[in-house]
Amino acid sequence: MKTFYAMRRANGDWFAVADKGDLRMPIFKNSGDAMTARSRDPGMECFRPVTFDAGVLEELRRTEGHTASFLMITDPSRHLKHGLRLSFTELAPFMVT
């Protein structure tokens, strides 16, 4: 099972960015990339990288349905909106490879 990282606040809120009218959760390949992106975006100041795996994805599916949207971040030094846009169903296969 593949593990990624996302940014979460101590109260449990997930970090998301507005992208063309949708809120999308940035997903990172490692915690270092998440911290690099955090250092470049003051909106992430109160968020910390946490593991984002199939269990977390399933938790989101139960609470949000299949409406959750994501940005797979390949270069954390660029603006987050340059990530790969993925729907819930497009991200799910990445979690099991």
Give the location of each predicted region.
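Conserved NAD+-utilizing ADP-ribose enzyme module
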Residues: 1-97
